[in-house]
From Swiss-Prot:
<feature type="region of interest" description="Disordered">
    <location>
        <begin position="504"/>
        <end position="524"/>
    </location>
</feature>
<feature type="region of interest" description="Disordered">
    <location>
        <begin position="143"/>
        <end position="175"/>
    </location>
</feature>
<feature type="coiled-coil region">
    <location>
        <begin position="243"/>
        <end position="268"/>
    </location>
</feature>
<protein>
    <recommendedName>
        <fullName>Protein FAM161A</fullName>
    </recommendedName>
</protein>
<dbReference type="InterPro" id="IPR019579">
    <property type="entry name" value="FAM161A/B"/>
</dbReference>
<dbReference type="GO" id="GO:0005814">
    <property type="term" value="C:centriole"/>
</dbReference>
<keyword id="KW-0969">Cilium</keyword>
<dbReference type="GO" id="GO:0005737">
    <property type="term" value="C:cytoplasm"/>
</dbReference>
<comment type="similarity">
    <text>Belongs to the FAM161 family.</text>
</comment>
<keyword id="KW-0966">Cell projection</keyword>
<comment type="function">
    <text>Involved in ciliogenesis.</text>
</comment>
<keyword id="KW-0206">Cytoskeleton</keyword>
<feature type="compositionally biased region" description="Polar residues">
    <location>
        <begin position="152"/>
        <end position="161"/>
    </location>
</feature>
<feature type="compositionally biased region" description="Basic and acidic residues">
    <location>
        <begin position="588"/>
        <end position="600"/>
    </location>
</feature>
<feature type="coiled-coil region">
    <location>
        <begin position="518"/>
        <end position="544"/>
    </location>
</feature>
<keyword id="KW-0175">Coiled coil</keyword>
<feature type="region of interest" description="Disordered">
    <location>
        <begin position="588"/>
        <end position="647"/>
    </location>
</feature>
Length: 647
């Protein structure tokens, strides 16, 4: 389908490819050979003077003219030698032909306007342009160019035909324009003014001149030759005729004025002033003398300064002075210095004896006694923290939590009619709590010293262990030489020092093991409690409403309170009045059962539960919590705490 459509479009197209008439193959004219091309000389030419005896029909002749006209514009590329000069010559030829055709059209148009009686003021300009243009047109072409541009001659007839068609179209337009112009001219026929009459006469004269110029001004073989300017001749004539320009006249006038002014100044008389007497005074000589005196004074002054600062050379005296000083110093140093050799003192005998060990023991004992006495003094002067003192003082006066009934109660409680002001009580309680909170003191650590190493049982055990090691080890047996044998040579003092150092090292006992076990157990329990607290905290966080929900709840509460207050204001009530009445009504409801029974004034009110009692119970709970925390701290006590207790 697409192929059929393409073939139909190609067949119906206006542009058709050239075909060889013999082979019917698509081939352009310049690609064919010379023998295959149709020669115009063989065919019957309407332009040639000689005609054949055969008579050609009219339809064949018209068809031949059409084909001939079409063949004239066919451009044979093989004849062109592809040079720029030939190309530009051909372009110039075409341009000249086009200009010639346009001139013919203009002349025809002007002729029509002249026949219709319309004046065109541009005729003179066009005529002048024709004259100048004719000078620029080329007279003839070279024979070589004529041979190469044979086929371009057929362009002018086609242009002529197109010009005839355009003139026919322009003729219709010109008739319309001429009729409009005639109407405009007839509109001014009623006026009779001499100026217009003169213009009309001038118009008729101009038309006559144009007619004569059209007839006379035809193309002629004349060329305008430029002539040189005659400026020098003109200037010489002006000089002969004494013709001056405006600038020359002005210059002469100015010179005359200046000359007259100078002559007037020269004719004036003047008298010179006498020479002043100061001119005759010898001022210059005085200045020269003054300068010489100043120069002499400066020279003498500078000489005096130089003589004062000048000093003679004293190298020999300086060297002698140095030698004497050096000798004096040497004598002084030899007299003072005495040869003192170092001599070490002998080692005191007390070091090798047992007295030093006893003295060290005594000093250590005195130190321990002093520290013990100091600890007792500090213990007596110390006091409990304020929180524990307050709890102890309060514990003696506080009431018991649980009350046991002792049979029937003999007295009846007195119920007070007055309602306490809970807000003031709460504020007072907060103040008391803040005061007690700020009054806490920090406990200070005190030095301590354990005396477990001084126990006799431990010393005996250590000595027995040392003896067993010395007996059982292989190094102490013969024939081996052991370092322990050399230790027996040392004195008893060094042995006692070694024993003391060994006794001071901590030993693991059963009590310490039990204490460590208890500590580990408590730590495990503490970690479990901590994990439980974390889980409870996470649960609270999960159950806690979101921030948006809390904001919504708070907004709802505020809106409800605002609505409640608005209702109270509308009714003319006060918030305090409502709270008082509500509290009194609640108390009346509780007391309504016992209205008939009156309580005597002398009875006690021990059974009442006022707000103060509730607050006391809260304080008791706090003190119980503090005591539990103290117990936990005791449970987590370390060896250092036990050492402090022993001290």
């Amino acid at each position: 389908m697409a192929q059929a459509h393409r073939e139909s479009v190609l067949a119906a197209a206006c542009v058709r490819t050239p075909v060889n008439p013999y082979t019917k193959a698509p081939l352009t004219l310049y690609e064919r050979e010379l023998g295959d091309r149709p020669h115009p000389s063989a065919s019957v030419s309407p332009r040639g003077p000689a005609r054949t005896s055969m008579e050609v029909p009219a339809d064949l002749e018209s068809r031949f003219c059409k084909t001939r006209r079409c063949q004239d514009w066919v451009f044979d590329i093989s004849d062109i030698h592809h040079s720029e000069k030939d190309y530009y010559v051909q372009v110039e030829k075409l341009k000249n032909a086009h200009l010639h055709n346009m001139e013919q059209l203009e002349k025809m148009y002007d002729r029509k306007l002249h026949l219709n009686g319309v004046h065109n003021p541009e005729n003179e300009k066009r005529v002048a342009e024709d004259v100048y243009r004719s000078a620029w047109e080329p007279k003839s072409l070279l024979p070589a160019q004529h041979d190469h541009l044979k086929q371009s001659r057929s362009v002018s007839p086609s242009l002529a035909e197109s010009s005839h068609e355009s003139t026919d179209e322009d003729y219709g337009d010109s008739e319309h324009s001429v009729s409009a112009r005639n109407k405009i001219l007839h509109m001014w026929n009623e006026f009779t003014v001499e100026d217009y009459v003169r213009d009309s006469e001038y118009f008729s004269q101009e038309i006559a001149k144009n007619k004569t110029s059209k007839k006379s001004k035809e193309w002629s073989h004349k060329i305008t030759i430029p002539e040189p300017f005659q400026m020098t001749v003109r200037e010489s004539k002006k000089r002969e005729m004494n013709i001056k320009s405006k600038s020359e006249i002005e210059l002469e006038n100015n010179l005359l004025k200046e000359k007259l002014e100078e002559e007037a100044e020269c004719q004036k008389k003047f008298r010179a002033n006498p020479v002043p007497s100061s001119v005759y005074l010898p001022l210059y000589q005085e200045i020269v003398e003054r300068n010489e005196e100043r120069r002499r004074f400066v020279k003498e002054k500078s000489k005096e300064i130089l003589l004062a600062t000048q000093k003679p050379f004293q190298f020999i005296e300086r060297e002698e002075r140095k030698k004497t000083l050096r000798l004096d110093l040497m004598q002084f140093s030899t007299s003072e210095t005495s040869t003192s050799h170092f001599k070490a003192k002998p080692v005191p005998k007390s070091i090798y004896g047992t007295s030093i060990v006893e003295r060290l023991k005594e000093e250590e004992l005195y130190r321990g006694i002093r520290t013990h006495m100091r600890a007792q003094e500090l213990l007596q002067s110390s006091s409990y923290p304020t929180s524990t003192l307050a709890s102890g003082a309060h514990s003696g006066t506080k009431k018991g939590r649980c009350y046991k009934l002792k049979g029937k109660q003999e007295h009846k409680p007195k119920i007070s009619d007055t309602i306490p002001h809970f807000q003031t009580i709460h504020e007072n309680q907060q103040k008391r709590l803040l005061e007690s909170k700020s009054a806490k003191h920090v406990t200070l650590c005190e030095p301590f010293q354990l005396r477990t190493s001084n126990i006799t049982s431990h010393k005996e055990k250590i000595e027995m262990d040392i003896q067993a090691d010395e007996e059982n080890l292989k190094e102490t047996r013969w024939p081996y030489k052991s370092p322990r044998a050399s230790a027996q040579i040392h004195s008893a003092g060094t042995m006692n020092l070694r024993l003391e150092t060994l006794s001071q090292t901590p030993r693991s006992t059963e009590s310490s093991k039990r204490r460590e076990y208890a500590i580990r157990k408590r730590e495990k329990q503490r970690t479990k409690d901590y994990m439980k607290e974390l889980e409870a905290m996470e649960q609270r966080v999960l159950n806690k409403p979101l921030l948006i929900e809390r904001v919504a709840q708070r907004n709802a509460l505020l809106s409800a309170e605002k609505q409640y207050l608005n209702v109270l204001h509308e009714l003319g009530l006060c918030e305090e009045f409502v709270t008082k009445n509500g509290q009194s009504s609640s108390v009346d409801e509780h007391v309504g059962v016992r209205e008939e029974k009156k309580i005597p004034q002398g009875e006690s009110t021990e059974g009442t539960l006022a707000l103060e009692d509730l607050l006391d119970d809260e304080e008791d709970d706090k003190y119980d919590c503090e005591s539990e925390e103290a117990e936990e701290e005791d449970a987590y006590s370390t060896d250092e705490d036990h050492r402090i207790e022993e001290i």
